[in-house]
């Protein structure tokens, strides 16, 4: 038996004034068919009432306790874009952002700039005091930053003010150690250098001519040291792969030992080639026991408050599932389908609202649920579970779970 965990990033939502969500209103005949043929329920990736990041959510969904394995998003982001992180490295995720001359943030995502490779070159390879700067763009406005050198610490604050109209925050040490103080000073120096190098860069001068937000600042957050994590194959006995478009999810996969399958045209944006990803899933199942799949577009739409786009993306994902379910053997493959978190249109951010989940395959106890949405699956046989329950349930269905006790 094989298994797929199919995650629609940012899937869940809250009802609008008409009582609808993008998922409830979307035309999703395949998801609904899977709900009718599967066992359904509700799922909180980390815990009830906890707003998860995509990082902690995916760790939990893969069966890892995020409270003991998560050190910050930075190491995963860096790993996902190909940086070989080492013990002692301090890693951050970053946004390219638009700031004024006072470092007040005008656009947190620099107008969702698409190509930042030339800007990356201005920062990657710098050396500040005795610390090497490794900087890699990770798709659009996202990037990863790694500090490598002696005497560093991850006990420092973030620069992200979280909202536009506020200044980029000074980095401060969070304890009294000389390592934290040194690291904070290095990052503060880097931010000043970044503004000086990026503000008048030809890429940004051209964006000004087009009245587009410039990418003249990097805003580090999610600092962390590289965690020690048991490898997925050792933990489960399964040969695992990951198909995802974003650097963060690829980084999590690499960190736990999943093979990352790159799919041309899949970059983690709403414009990704969803069907190419569907074809890759079916093909990859020929060689692997397990696949983690992440499809990102609905989350982007939620963050932008775009109801219609989120609905459209969910319908496109349904088309993916049509191909997948028609081209795999239901007697040989289980699919656990859900989201990693809700990204409600009204919040334009992650929330703790539970997600619909269905497990589809030959030996599940089919329940009475007939539609896959936030308002229907609570009636299902899975009841209300956490993300860390998914892998044990799948392994039990696959007859590879170890017995607890005599």
From Swiss-Prot:
It is an enzyme of class 5 (isomerase). Keywords: Glycolysis, Isomerase. The keyword Isomerase applies. It catalyses: (2R)-2-phosphoglycerate = (2R)-3-phosphoglycerate. One of its GO terms (biological process) is glycolytic process. One of its GO terms (molecular function) is metal ion binding. InterPro entries: Alkaline_phosphatase_core_sf (IPR017850), ApgAM_prokaryotes (IPR023665), Metalloenzyme (IPR006124), Pglycerate_mutase_ApgM (IPR004456). Pfam families: Metalloenzyme, PhosphMutase. It comes from the Archaea. Pathway: Carbohydrate degradation; glycolysis; pyruvate from D-glyceraldehyde 3-phosphate: step 3/5. Its EC number is 5.4.2.12. Catalyzes the interconversion of 2-phosphoglycerate and 3-phosphoglycerate. This is 2,3-bisphosphoglycerate-independent phosphoglycerate mutase. It comes from Methanococcus maripaludis (strain C6 / ATCC BAA-1332). The gene is apgM.
